[in-house]
């Protein structure tokens, strides 16, 4: 769970090994970043039941998008209403990276566009694209929970022109080109997957990347340019960033 102070996580006491956590923080794959942590014993309660009952707070993006759980009722309407039951997947609009991509998409003409949602999480980005007129969305995630959750959220929103599969960027081999690619993952995976993304872009295809810090942008821009992409612009919010590219 993202908080203003960092990331909060939970693990069963019997499965926790401090030595493993220490070794992982020592090799954290971001230059110049030192990870610290503190431990506390959590209250003994049924956390799944708590999450199912309370969900997340409704999120409004640019006063035009409303993202909420099925449990939220009597909310003031919005131009785009998205129902998300996130379970264990990422993507409710509460994180700056998701919000910034949605803000970008609001200003884009998605009519009749084909969209790739890479690392889809809850599927919120792809679902929004269908609501905004995209011809079709093809999504994937390496996590089976996310794939199943995206399918559930597609049903909740009445989405029929979107497909989601389990896998990583290697499953893009042989796919037709997309008009728009969305990838909200992290710096290292993006750097590794950029060649696969470019392989399914045609001239004038665009790509929005996020899931990384402002200081990571030069590496990503350099890699993208080496693959024949043109940097268009970027956005920032509280040290998180998005990048927009176009294939030449």
What are these regions (language model features)?
Residues 88, 92-170:
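Conserved SAM/SAH cofactor-binding pocket of Class I
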Residues 80-86:
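A short, charged helix-loop
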Residues 66, 81, 113-114:
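Residues that mark the start of a beta-strand
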Residues 142-248:
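S-adenosylmethionine
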